[in-house]
Amino acid sequence: MPAESIPDVCLKDEVARSEHPVLIIDGMNLFVRCYCAYPAVSSHGYQLGGMLGFIKTLTRLSNDLVPRGIVIAWEGGGSQRRRALYPDYKMNRRPEKLNRFYQDDIPDSDENRLHQNVALIKLLKHVPVWQVYADCCEGDDIIAHIVNCQLVNRNVIIGSSDKDMHQLLNARVRQYSFHKKRVLTADDVYAEYGILAENFGIAKAVCGDPTDNVPGVPRIGFKTLTKHIPLLRCEATVLDDVLKYAASHRQSSLPCARIWADEQLVRRNWELVKLDISSLPAARSAQITSVLSADAPALDIVGVCQILADEGTSNLNVSELTTTFARYAGCRIM
């Protein structure tokens, strides 16, 4: 499978009105996707698809989306707050598997994946991008913090296939889906789900999220929800208003009665699915501000080549990488 290919339609036309948005990459989301799908083996016989696929995808996105700068947001160990609230949170996740194997070996060990992730982070330190993470926070929470607290005056494109990002979309924030290979807007979320993007988190709190092992109200899906609680598709709202609406209509609507009866489940789910910027410690927030306020570092192509040599690969177009990323050296996003 090639690196995340961009469809023939020119994405530059889609993002033209953004006037060079900041591109924020959900680092682990893209890395795991490339790790599972991209076939690349080093001269040492080890898998390198995660690292090489990530760099090639980042290069392609940079050329097609033409951002003013690139931020990579990494997982910081997951959310202790969510696990304390619901111990089964994300416990259904299976280890990532390669979708291919060579001879009789299936080289999908955690050790190899971790090695690639560390090597990728080291390589990116030689590239004009900003890398950020926060202890005990998930990557999407960090992205929400950057979008809503750090880059409040910037247009943003979030690179992620995670539907949780839908709740961040508005006039200045869009999402590039690695899965759909296109830029998504708040209007696209409404067209697909019949729900305003800013209400997407509330809808997930009611319907649940099987991906994260979060159970919803029984027999309530998105279509049923929007039919019986129309305010989700009409206006930006808050969870309390949705629950009040369900309570006031429980006699005439069985779905509303179910939501009303499961109020505590819905409230717990809301704490699980909302992108929480309040859990970020002040010291870590200040550190992220410091990182994003700095000029982008210079491109150290010698350092990049050294890491590639150490990993036993020359499977990157260094000339293209230089042309793509040299323009970001010294740029600012804050």
Residue ranges: model-predicted function:
Residues 2-8, 12-19, 60, 64-74, ...:
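Non-catalytic nucleic-acid-binding/docking modules located in mid-to-C-terminal regions
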Residues 2-9, 13-159, 165-183, 274, ...:
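Noncatalytic, basic helical substrate-engagement surface that gates or grips nucleic-acid strands
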